[in-house]
Amino acid sequence: MAATGEALTPQGYIQHHLTNLSVGEGFWTWHIDSLLFSVGLGVLFLWIFRSVGKKATTGVPGKLQCFVEMIVEFVDNSVKETFHGRNALIAPLALTIFVWVFMMNFMDMVPVDWLPHTAAMLGVPYLKVVPTTDLNITFSLALGVFLLIIYYSIKVKGVSGFVKELTLQPFNHWAMIPVNLLLESVTLIAKPISLALRLFGNLYAGELIFILIALMYGANWLIASLGVTLQLGWLIFHILVITLQAFIFMMLTIVYLSMAHEDH
């Protein structure tokens, strides 16, 4: 329900759950809920992994240590199999991306009404709890990856090497420089755009389905009982989706940075 306590129509209910808590206008609009949840989950990730690292023992590890070690080993193996350059920062970066994106995605598992209704009782009119359903968050993550691609491309190949890569590929002839530049520029720019839109699209669609299922509880008992079955089924399937999307974002980041380290 809205902060005013008025009953919402189905359309209003959907719109309410898909609206961010914002301040400012236009380009300078800040989505406070997305910022708080994304930063908060990032801090939680750092605290958990730092605590486990400090308390790690060579003896019989606890369940949390085993779980963290399993994730670290999985990410480390993924980096070793995919990244062919030498850079000690890639594995920690991949670990951060995988766990952080997964944690933001996992907020989609929280029942859609719990936190927004709690916020409404505290006088907060809107609360969108899944940061990766906000284009600002997914594009910010993708922009960070894009800047790293540019940085390492120039660092490994030099400015001249990077320019040659943009102007002399795929057709190695001076007359084809404009065509090469156009093709390579589109390819380069498409990387962060595809990263951002893929993550956003999958999580936004998943959130919308949860909201539509939640609407079924307001109907008669037969439809409400069907909603319970649908919600359970979608919940199980969506666990795979949120994990897969975090994995894809991580793997594409590794692949793009590996390509940036290749000196032709």
Swiss-Prot record:
GO terms for biological process: proton motive force-driven plasma membrane ATP synthesis. Belongs to the ATPase A chain family. It holds the Pfam family ATP-synt_A. InterPro entries: ATP_syn_F0_a_bact/chloroplast, ATP_synth_F0_asu, ATP_synth_F0_asu_AS, F0_ATP_A_sf. One of its GO terms (molecular function) is proton-transporting ATP synthase activity, rotational mechanism. Key component of the proton channel; it plays a direct role in the translocation of protons across the membrane. Coiled coil: none annotated. F-type ATPases have 2 components, CF(1) - the catalytic core - and CF(0) - the membrane proton channel. CF(1) has five subunits: alpha(3), beta(3), gamma(1), delta(1), epsilon(1). CF(0) has three main subunits: a(1), b(2) and c(9-12). The alpha and beta chains form an alternating ring which encloses part of the gamma chain. CF(1) is attached to CF(0) by a central stalk formed by the gamma and epsilon chains, while a peripheral stalk is formed by the delta and b chains. Gene3D superfamilies: ATP synthase, F0 complex, subunit A. SUPFAM superfamilies: F1F0 ATP synthase subunit A. One of its GO terms (cellular component) is plasma membrane. Keywords: ATP synthesis, Cell inner membrane, Cell membrane, CF(0), Hydrogen ion transport, Ion transport, Membrane, Transmembrane, Transmembrane helix, Transport. The chain crosses the membrane at residues 29-49, 87-107, 134-154, 177-197, 208-228, 235-255. It is a multi-pass membrane protein. This is ATP synthase subunit a. It is found in: Cell inner membrane.
